[in-house]
Amino acid sequence: MKNIIYITIFLLTLTAITYSQSVMEFEAGSALTIDSGADISADEIIMNGTYTGGGTINGNSAYVLNLTVLIEGFYNSSTDTMVGDTVRVYLRNLSSPYAIVDSSACYLSSSGIGTLIFSNAFNGTNYYLDIRHRNSIETWSAAGQSFTSFFGTYDFSNANSQAYGNNMAQVNTSPVKFALFSGDVNQDGFVELSDVVLIYNDASNFVTGYANTDVNGDNLIDLSDLLITYNNSSAFVSKVTP
């Protein structure tokens, strides 16, 4: 059970407190005062008021990653913008078997910018960033990304070398931009005939709305989605990972 301590401005003097499988919640008051040398320990601490004193409060910290990722089919080179959508990012160890350390999802803006929050990372430790999108090729960062003072930044869009194996599509020349390959509708790591067939079937049935077969994000499954996927299938696009 996750331990959460809610602290909402309550006047109290503590010598030491550690909660296990419980919640400590204070609803009213003015401040939390901790005696010198006292400790508060929990898995998560949410502070809405203030505290003073010489002790420590220990809880899991939030690690913030500012990410920039473009999606090939969703990107419009004439406006240098894209249709916003959700991606999930996995933090992975740098060494085989590249175990997943944590994951977080965010909504990418029209500029491809999103903010992710992780709780199981560590400052100064390098992690691969494994990007997943509903109909794009799984793409990893070229090298390890670390957090400094709980913050990190990574931009996949400014160079092909930002992706492991240089595995992205160039979607603009001025400014130079790169994006995740689109068309992996069934998320098997390949853009191939099976993806084309899925799109063809949905297009034939006039499917609309938020669907994996909508490769360009316009909420219509039609020829434009087929063309993007067919071209990447013909180029044998697939995921490239360590």
Indicate residue ranges for each PLM-predicted region.
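Short coil-to-beta strand junction motifs in C2/discoidin
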Residues: 79-88, 124
